[in-house]
């Protein structure tokens, strides 16, 4: 009997319980994702110098974000960065996600060299009706952070519409702001 690759699924209930407002924060909680490669906080990562857009690329198994394929509802997302070296997970607000599927085995035989370490598929809520907002604010010493997300959805006889977005802002925290650094 043939066996397939295991799929790690993070469903809507787990997404809500995680208490995150961004997709990148949610993906950090999946054990198979060792990092988000080049990101706004890790510019020294692989391809970090070319990441002027501050994108967050998914990094399975620590090989690099260019070896992990990121899909939105089974379709490829356009690449980010000045050299197209990664796909930005932060372009999809976490509030719109119905579930996240992670295949942490190589999928290059199906998807090509973009999926050497695996595939992450973001599945959106396509039939949401109503309004929902999430606001998170945090303060610690000389650092503060604000994250806001909202989703709106409506449906009619022949279709539906879902619009979602998120906003995040944080102050910088330099090493000199810490007395022990």
Where are these regions (language model features)?
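Periplasmic-side early beta-strands and strand-to-turn transitions of outer-membrane beta-barrels
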Residues: 136, 158-181
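Non-catalytic regulatory/gating segments with a bias toward low-complexity or hydrophobic composition
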Residues: 15, 27, 100-101, 120-122
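Extracytoplasmic beta-strand/coil segments of soluble accessory domains associated
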Residues: 28-76
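N-terminal periplasmic accessory domains that precede
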Residues: 25-26, 56-59, 88-90, 114-135, ...
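Short strand-turn segments of transmembrane beta-barrel domains in outer membranes
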Residues: 106, 128-153, 163
């Amino acid at each position: 009997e043939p066996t397939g690759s295991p799929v790690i699924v993070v469903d809507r209930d787990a997404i809500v319980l995680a208490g995150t407002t961004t997709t990148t924060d949610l993906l950090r909680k999946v054990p198979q994702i060792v990092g988000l490669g080049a990101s706004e906080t890790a510019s020294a990562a692989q391809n970090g110098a070319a990441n002027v857009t501050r994108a967050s690329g998914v990094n399975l198994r620590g090989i690099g974000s260019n070896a992990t394929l990121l899909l939105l509802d089974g379709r490829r997302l356009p690449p980010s960065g000045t050299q197209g070296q990664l796909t930005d997970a932060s372009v999809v607000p976490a509030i719109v996600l119905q579930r996240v599927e992670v295949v942490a085995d190589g999928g290059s035989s199906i998807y090509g060299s973009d999926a050497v370490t695996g595939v992450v598929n973001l599945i959106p809520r396509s039939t949401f009706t109503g309004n929902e907002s999430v606001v998170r604010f945090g303060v610690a010493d000389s650092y503060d952070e604000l994250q806001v997300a909202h989703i709106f959805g409506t449906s009619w006889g022949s279709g539906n519409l879902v619009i979602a977005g998120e906003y995040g802002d944080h102050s910088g925290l330099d090493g000199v702001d810490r007395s022990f650094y």
